[in-house]
Each structure stands twice: as C-alpha cells, then as structure tokens.
C-alpha cells in the first residue's frame, strides 16, 4: 500500500516550537496489490504500476514552490523490494521498520507512525517556510520602506521645484512687466528725441538766420563806421581849415584897423580882394561828396525808427545828465580854487598866449601840470592857434556829449565843434571860431597836443601856466545857451554859469542849431561892434 501526503494538512504542532496554526490536507491512502510470491509477473505489474504513477506524476506540472513529499511502500511479503523500483522517480524512499512477526503490526498502527513522522517533517518544513516567508516579508518591507523614502524625497524635490517654478514664473512676469514699461519708456523717449531734434533743428535754423542777419548788420555797421571815420577826419580837416581862416581873418582885421585912417578906398579895395580870396579858399576846403554823404546820414538818422529814436533819446538824456553833473562838479571845484587862491597874484604879463593848457580846465591844469612840462618839448600841432593880447586869462567853451570824458577826469574838454578865445576889454577884440556844428551826441572827444607858440615867451608862459592856474574872478553873467539839444524846450535848456577875468565885461555867446545843414553864430563884442558870421 502506498501512502501519499498532499502539500498541506490541518493539524497542530506537537513540538510547541511554533504557536501558529498550519492547515494541511488529509493524507491519501492507496492500496497496491502485491503478489504472494516474487514472480516476474508480479514484479512487472508492480513496475508497470510504478511507471504509470511516475508518468501520471510527470504529466502533472509541479507547483511553485516545488515541494516533494516522501512516499512509504508497505508490502505484506517478507521480502522487501528495493526502494528505487517501488518509488516514483525523483522521490526519496524511507524504510519503515517492520518486525519479523508481520502479523503483529496492523495497517492502522503503521499509518499512525507514518502520520506522526510525516507531521514532524511537515512541521519542520512549515517552520522553514515560515522563516522563508518572514525573510521575504522583511525584504518586502525593506523594499517598501526604501520606496517610501524615495517617494518622500521625490515629493520634497517636487515641492522645491514647484516653489522655484513659482519664483521663476513671478520673476518672468516681473521681467515682462519691466520689459513692457521699458518699451513704453523707449517709445516716449523716441518721441521726445524726435521732438527735441526737430526743435533743435528749428532753433539752429533760427539762430543761423539770426547769425546771418547779425553778420549783415555787422558788415553794414563796419561800413558805416568807416564812413563815419572818414567823415570825422573830414570834419577835423574842416575845423582846422576854419581855424586857420579865422586866424587869417584876425590878422587882416588887425592890419585893416592899422591902415584904416586916411586910406578908406585902398582899405575897401583890399578888403574886397581879401573877401574873394577867403571865399575861394573856403569853397576849396569843402568836399561835395563828403558833404552829400553827411547830409544823407543826417537824413537817415532823422528818419530812423521810433524805437531807435526813443532809445537814442534815452541814451542822450543819460549822457546829458552825466554831463551836467560833471560840469556842476567842475564849477564847485572852480569856486573852491577861486576862494583859496584869491590872495595870490602872479599873472602880471601883458599878453596871454593860447596853448593846450589853456584849453584844459583849471582842475586838469593843476593835475597835469608836471606831465605837460615833461612833454612840452616833444609834442607838436600842425596848425597855429589864434592869439589875442590881453592882460587877463582867456575863457574857453567846450561842448561834448560823449561817454569817454566821464570815464577820465584828465581828458581834454575839447571838441571838433567850437572853441572861443575871448580877450579882455583893453583891445576890445573878441574872436569866435566855429567848427562844424552837428548834433551834440555826435561830437568826438579827442586829446589835443601842444600848440606851437609864435611869441618869444611861449615856453616861459607854458611853464608858468602849468605850475599854477590863473587867477579867476567871481562868477558873472556870462552864460552858454545850447538849443535844439535833442529837441528840448527852451525852459529845459541848461544855462551854465561861467567865470570870466577881472576886467572882462558881460559877454553872451549863443550857439543855435535848428537844422544839421544850417550853422548860425552870433558874437557880441565888448566894444559895441557886432560881428555876425553865418555859414
């Protein structure tokens, strides 16, 4: 009989090594008929049965895990067959001890022993399987723990990446906003640049036009300045020629007075001849082209724009006020010097020779006396002055309206306009030399050099006059009236008081200029002889 046990059975472990319950299947008992004698037929039948069982076992595939259980072959014969022939292929065979008295052992007892041994083996196998299962479970738990840790790490990395992704998204949004703002700002700057470039182009064009106009005006001003310079030179020549003519007239008058008694016809003829010569020389000294240019300039100045005329008037008013202040200061200084020098008298010569020191004011003569003495031998004048004999000093009238004479107190108060040499009442002569009377604003201040004296005592007189100014008498009724001074009214015309010599009588000199082309002079002499000169 063959007893086969399945893989599992339901029983409790007797050894007590494991407290767990293991379920096993019930054993299957198979009866194998065995012949009474060992015949070849019986052997063949047994071998065939074993081979059939082996084939049946071979046909069924093994399960995983493959566990093979031992089989026990129990035979009633006394002769035991070899295990290799009775057991299937690949299954171990176990020898069950059988007593010699075969009748004593029953089938149930053999089954019990077999079951007991089998249960012990199954328990060991179960323990082995439990150990294997625990190892597998531990390994699975270890792997699960490793995977859990890996998942945790991946989650942490994912969280960090999400945070960095959010930061990058915010940064990209910020950069995009900044880019949009920059683009808007760039467009605004581009518009502003276009506007400024167009504005700068307009400004450059306007300034270029202004520069061109200013250059044109500068060229015209330069031409006008050249013309005015030439005209000034021409006027200076006219003044010098008129002064020389006046000196010649004075000499002729003196000669006519000496030859007047007893020869009236001869003196009359000589006077007519002299007048013709003077008129001819007077016409020679005039240049028609320059005179026409001068008239044109005066006409254009009269027809100038009202704004320029107003500016010119304001400038002339300021200059006039400065001129009046300067003249008043000079008068105050003159009064002070008169009061301080009344007790001194050293000017006792019978004649007064005109010089450049005489054409200066008293203050300037006191300040520049030493300089005139040092330079008296070096400087010369081209024309000779008008000389009059007198026991007192000469009085000079200067008119100028230029700014340079206010800048320096040592400038010569002379002009190209008028110069008067007045003598005392001893000889009864008075000479007035008139130049080119133009508008006062157009007069030029210039420094005159020393005049060469004709008298023998000129150098002595110059040194003496440079050391100390002459004695001045108290102010009298002599006055200088300037009319048509920028169209001023007569009540606003300045009346300047002057001081004359001790023996000089009241003398009035009137200079009137109503038009630029007209010149009028009236001189009242002390000897009741009126001399009128009209140019």
Curated annotation (Swiss-Prot):
Feature: compositional bias, Polar residues: 503-525
Keyword Nucleotide-binding (UniProt): no
Source species, domain of life: Eukaryota
Keywords: Cell junction, Coiled coil
GO cellular component: adherens junction
The keyword Coiled coil belongs to this UniProt entry's keyword annotation: yes
Region described as Disordered: spans on this chain: 1-67, 254-277, 503-535
A Pfam cross-reference name: CCDC85
Traits of the deletion mutant: Mutants are 97% viable. However, the Rho GTPase-activating protein, pac-1, does not localize to adherens junctions.
Compartmental location: Cell junction, Adherens junction
Compositional bias ranges of the Low complexity kind: 36-57, 526-535
Coiled-coil regions listed: 109-172, 198-242
Annotated function: Linker protein which helps to recruit the Rho GTPase-activating protein, pac-1, to adherens junctions.
Assembly and interaction partners: Interacts with pac-1 and jac-1.
PANTHER family hit by this protein: CCDC85, RE60986P
Membership in a protein family: Belongs to the CCDC85 family.
Protein name: PAC-1 interacting and coiled-coil domain-containing protein 1
Organism of this sequence: Caenorhabditis elegans
Gene: picc-1
């Amino acid at each position: 009989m063959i007893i086969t046990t399945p893989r599992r059975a339901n029983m409790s472990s007797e050894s007590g090594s494991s407290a767990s319950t293991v379920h096993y299947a019930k054993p299957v008992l198979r009866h194998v008929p065995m012949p009474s004698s060992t015949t070849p037929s019986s052997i063949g039948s047994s071998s065939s049965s074993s081979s059939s069982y082996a084939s049946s076992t071979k046909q069924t595939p093994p399960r995983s895990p493959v566990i093979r259980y031992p089989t026990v072959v129990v035979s009633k014969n006394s002769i035991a067959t070899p295990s290799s022939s009775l057991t299937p292929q690949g299954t171990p065979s176990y020898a069950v001890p059988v007593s010699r008295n075969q009748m004593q052992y029953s089938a149930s007892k053999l089954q019990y022993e077999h079951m007991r041994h089998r249960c012990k083996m199954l328990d060991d196998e179960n323990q082995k399987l439990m150990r294997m299962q625990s190892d597998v479970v531990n390994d699975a738990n270890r792997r699960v723990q490793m995977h859990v840790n890996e998942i945790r790490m991946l989650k942490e990395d994912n969280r960090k990446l999400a945070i960095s992704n959010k930061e990058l998204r915010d940064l990209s949004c910020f950069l995009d906003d900044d880019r949009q703002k920059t683009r808007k700002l760039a467009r605004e700057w581009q518009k502003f640049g276009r506007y400024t470039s167009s504005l700068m182009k307009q400004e450059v064009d306007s300034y270029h036009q202004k520069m061109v106009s200013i250059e044109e005006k500068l060229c015209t001003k330069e031409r006008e300045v050249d013309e005015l310079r030439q005209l000034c030179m021409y006027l200076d020549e006219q003044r010098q020629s008129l002064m020389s003519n006046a000196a010649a007239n004075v000499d002729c008058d003196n000669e006519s007075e000496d030859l007047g008694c007893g020869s009236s016809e001869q003196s009359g003829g000589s006077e007519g001849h002299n007048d013709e010569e003077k008129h001819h020389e007077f016409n020679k000294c005039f240049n028609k082209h320059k005179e026409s240019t001068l008239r044109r300039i005066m006409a254009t100045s009269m027809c100038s724009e009202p704004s320029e005329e107003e500016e010119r008037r304001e400038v002339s008013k300021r200059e006039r006020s400065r001129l009046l202040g300067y003249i008043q200061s000079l008068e105050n200084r003159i009064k002070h010097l008169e009061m301080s020098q009344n007790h001194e008298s050293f000017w006792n010569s019978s004649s007064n020779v005109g010089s450049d020191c005489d054409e200066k004011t008293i203050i300037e003569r006191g300040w520049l006396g030493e300089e005139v003495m040092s330079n008296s031998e070096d400087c010369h004048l081209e024309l000779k002055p008008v000389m009059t004999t007198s026991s007192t000093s000469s009085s000079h009238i200067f008119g100028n309206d230029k700014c340079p004479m206010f800048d320096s107190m040592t400038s010569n108060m002379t002009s190209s306009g008028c110069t008067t040499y007045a003598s005392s009442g001893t000889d009864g002569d008075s000479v007035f030399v008139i130049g080119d009377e133009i508008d006062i604003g157009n007069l030029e201040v210039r420094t005159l050099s020393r005049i060469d004296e004709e008298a023998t005592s000129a150098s002595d007189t110059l040194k003496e006059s440079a050391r100390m100014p002459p004695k001045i008498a108290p102010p009298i009724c002599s006055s200088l009236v300037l009319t048509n001074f920028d169209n001023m009214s007569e009540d606003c015309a300045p009346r300047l008081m002057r001081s004359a010599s001790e023996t000089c009588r009241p003398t009035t000199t009137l200079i009137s200029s109503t038009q630029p082309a007209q010149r009028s002079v009236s001189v009242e002499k002390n000897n009741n002889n009126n001399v009128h000169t009209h140019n």
